[in-house]
Structures are given as C-alpha cells and as structure tokens.
Amino acid sequence: MLRYFTSGESHGEALVAFLSGLPAGLTVDQAFVDRELWRRQQGFGRGGRMKIETDKAHFLSGVHHGKTIGSPIAVMLENRDWQNWKESLPVETGDPEKHKRVASPRPGHADLAGALKYDFTEARYVLERASARESAARVAIGALAKLLLRELGVGVLSHVIAVGAVSIADREIAWEQIEPLARKNEVLLSCADADAEQRMKEEVDKVLRTGDSVGGVFEVVAHNVPPGLGSYVQWDERLDALLAAAVMSLQAVKAVEIGSGIQAAHSPGSAVHDEIGYKSDEGFAGFTRTRNHAGGLEGGVSNGQEIRVRGYLKPISTLRRPLQSVDFATREPVKAAYERSDVCVVPAAGVAAEAMVALTLARCALEKFGGDSMKEMKRNFQGYLEQLKNY
C-alpha cells in the first residue's frame, strides 16, 4: 500500500517527506522532480519567500543508481530561509527575547484554533506547521507518483480556470491546451486562455494595490486513466471520495468539485449524464461518451474518461491590511498579525493538487495491479488492458 507523511516547519531547517510502497525499478528522474518543485514556486502574486528558496529534492533513502529499490523513500528539501530564523526558532531553548511571537491570530488561518487545541500562548508554532510551505514536500513525492503513472501512460496536470471574478469555468479545456502550460519557463497564472490570463493578472494587480488577497479555482486533469480504478463496494474505496479528500487536504482549499458536479445539482438528469456509445477502435474497451460531466468517475470508479477535479481556493488569510483580531495575552482588540505572504497562489496550489491526485491514482493503481517491481506491475497492467480490449 502506498503511504506517505511529511514533516518540517515553514522556517525550520528542512522539510522531509516519507513515501512507502513504490515498486522497485522505477526510474527516478531528478530533473523532473526538481522541475515540479520549481513549478510550485511560480505564478504572479507570489511573495518574497519564493525569491529565497530554490527547492531541490535530496533523496536520503529508497533510491540508488537512479532507481527505486522497493524500500521506504525519504526526501529532504532544504529551507534556505532557515538561516534567517536560527535564533528566532531554535531547536534548543534559545533566547526568549529573540523569539518571534504571533501575538494576534489571523482570521481564516489555523492560528486561533491551533493555539486552543495545543494550549499555546501564541500562534508561532501553529503558523510554522499549518503553512502551505508544507505542500512542497508533497510535490516532491507526488513527482514520484507521476513518474509511476507515466509508466502506465497516465498524465496528470493542472490549469487555472478562475482568479477572483475572472473565470473560464464554463468551458472544458482540452488536454492538448493544458500540456504546454507545464513546459513554460515563465509562468504568469497558468491559464490556457491568454486573454483571460491577462484579466486574471489585472485582478491580482488590483488586490496588490489595496493590500488584499485573492483566491480562485484550479482544475487537475488526469489523462488516459483506464477504467476500473477505485471501487463502489466500500465507502472508503471510492475514488471520487479519495480524490476529494486529497485535494481538500491542501492549505486554503475550501471546496472540491468532480466533473460538472456543482452545475449538475441545478440541472435535470437528461442534461447531466454522459450518454454511452460504442466504436470498437476507441478508448480502452470501445465504449464512448458524448461528454464528460461525470469527470471520469461513476460510482466511485474511473470510467476511462479524463478525470477532472476542481479545487476552490479561498484568498490567502495573511493580509497586508490586516483584519480585526484580539491579542492573545491581553484579549484587547488589535489588528491581526502580518507576516511576509503571497497575494495569489492559485497556480501553485494547482501544482500541489496535481501531486495529491497523482499520489491517489498511484495508490489505486498499485492496489489494482500490484507488483513488487515495475516489471511485474507493468506486466499485470498490460494483462488488464488486454482484458479490456477483449471485453
């Protein structure tokens, strides 16, 4: 079973991710992993932290001579900014006068809830772990999941469909339009529509001028996923539930949609469900659809269409013009704490969501096809494709 955990704080020495369950013999493309980490750092509206960090994956175990060896993988990402925080956030007791307290909780952040839960007198430790910096570790191991899926012919990418009030959410963007976005070396807002992207930039510019922040919507597309991943037999095996939980787990995501789920709730069934046809030379088993409102999932199982998952991102909760809050110590009204932050992170969140979708699909693929080695897994996968072809 594919299992993963992360550790580390935003301004600590490093982030570490642990991944167990990958088969032996998977080629690890270091340049690809580092490129994924680079993609997460891009996008108009990112803060000053991204000028400090240059994330590179340092594999500590589980990978040798360029391949996985079947044992648990540990990967470390250095936090360069830690050099600026050694005295403020030491492992040992340190000098209390140099500690940087978060004295007033920020509305929308984990500050207050976390301080109450863990009995902290202020929110520094909450901020450190709840920060979206943690998602970099997920992107590193998500890149390995992408490499595994690539061996099965499956691709996972994202694009931005809304920033603030600017939206192209009513259109389905083809995979061929999304692919080039990941190859760009200059990333604006990762939208496939160039005109809409410029309007999105104007939206970010507007909130930059006012000291505010802005959210939006990204869509993750998994291309060439075979039917049969996930299951309807138990609630916790349903692929749509697994994907929703995976994407919702990302910082600032407040809603998840699969296919045209939101529109479907307001439409008659005849306008929602994807009619079925048959052409022997198409798809995995010859069955076709007139559209893909289901987002590639029916009954918790992949149906052979593209899987489409949308994440709805709230605006970042750290504002340069802070909202009203209360001082932890005095309980007196004050402005919420401010710490260097982003203004818009929708493209970066999309990359992190790619990682979560890839990890989820890789887990389901391993459960279905098994294999302690890549050779064994691919042999099992080819046998399943033959079964579908002869259905």
Give short role names for the model-derived ranges.
Residues 1-391:
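Generic N-terminal targeting/processing segments that precede catalytic cores or assembly contacts
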